[in-house]
UniProtKB/Swiss-Prot annotation:
This is HTH-type transcriptional regulator MurR. GO terms for biological process: carbohydrate derivative metabolic process; N-acetylmuramic acid catabolic process; negative regulation of DNA-templated transcription; regulation of carbohydrate catabolic process. InterPro entries: Homeodomain-like_sf, HTH_RpiR, RpiR-like, RpiR-like_SIS, SIS_dom, SIS_dom_sf, Tscrpt_reg_HTH_MurR, WH-like_DNA-bd_sf. Represses the expression of the murPQ operon involved in the uptake and degradation of N-acetylmuramic acid (MurNAc). Binds to two adjacent inverted repeats within the operator region. MurNAc 6-phosphate, the substrate of MurQ, is the specific inducer that weakens binding of MurR to the operator. Disulfide bonds: none annotated. HAMAP family: HTH_type_MurR (MF_02108). It comes from Escherichia fergusonii (strain ATCC 35469 / DSM 13698 / CCUG 18766 / IAM 14443 / JCM 21226 / LMG 7866 / NBRC 102419 / NCTC 12128 / CDC 0568-73). Keywords: Carbohydrate metabolism, DNA-binding, Repressor, Transcription, Transcription regulation. Residues 1-77 form the HTH rpiR-type domain. GO terms for molecular function: carbohydrate derivative binding; DNA binding; DNA-binding transcription factor activity. Pathway: Amino-sugar metabolism; N-acetylmuramate degradation [regulation].
Amino acid sequence: MLYLTKIRNAESEFTGNEQKIADFLQAKVSELKSVSSRKMAKQLGISQSSIVKFAQKLGAQGFTELRMALIGEYSASREKTNATALHLHSSITSDDSLEVIARKLNREKELALEQTCALLDYARLQKIIEVISKAPFIQITGLGGSALVGRDLSFKLMKIGYRVACEADTHVQATVSQALKKGDVQIAISYSGSKKEILLCAEAARKQGATVIAITSLTDSPLRRLAHFTLDTVSGETEWRSSSMSTRTAQNSVTDLLFVGLVQLNDVESLKMIERSSELTQRLK
C-alpha cells in the first residue's frame, strides 16, 4: 500500500490533529527512522493515541507499521529518482514541478510555525517582553539569514520608539556589545547557538551587565547556556542544508510575537507612532 499517496489523497477528509500528523509525516519522511510516536506527539502537542488512530485509519495496525512502510516508500522513491533528480532543499528534488515545490515549501513553513508556537513558554515570553520594554537600549545580533530576521525586528522596534542597534558587520556587533550597560538588552538570534561571533557578543554583553535573550533551537548550545532568557524555535532544517527557509519562518514568528507584545504594552502611543511612520513614508511616494 502506498501510504504517502493515500495521505495526499485523503487530506481533505482529515481533522485538525490528523492534518498535523499528515503534514509532519510528509515533511519529515526522510527522518522517520529516529521518530517515535511519543516524540512526534510531544512535538505536535497531541496524544499518542491520536497518532495510532491515524495509522489505523490509513489501514496500518499501528504507528510502527505505518512508519516502517513510509521509510520503505521513501527509500524506494529515492533509489528511483537519485539517478536523474538532484536533492535541492529538504524534500524538494530537481524533478519536482513548481506546484509540488509550492506545496512542499508551504507544508514545511506551516510545520515550523505550528511546532514553534506549540513549544513556546508564553509566561517566559511575557516576562521577556516586559524586560525589553524597560531597556534603555537594545542590540540585536545575528549572522546570515538570522541577521535578516534581526534587521526586520530592529525596524519594527524603532518604529515604536525603541533605541536599537542591528549591524551586519561582526566587528561593529562586538564593539556595540562591549558598550552595553546594566538594563540594556541584547537579542541574539542563532538557530545553531554555536557561532563564535554571536557567542563573543553575548559574552561581552553579559560582562557589561546587559540582559541576553537568545532566539535559538532546542539544542543544548553555548548560546543557550550564556543567555538569561531563551525563546525556542523549531525547524526541520539541519546544519548542512544550504538554505534556512523554515528556520527564518520560525524565527520571524517569534520576533513578530515580541513586536506585537510590545505594541500591546503601550498600545495607544505605539499605534500613534506607527500611524506617523506610515504618513511620512506615504509622502515619499
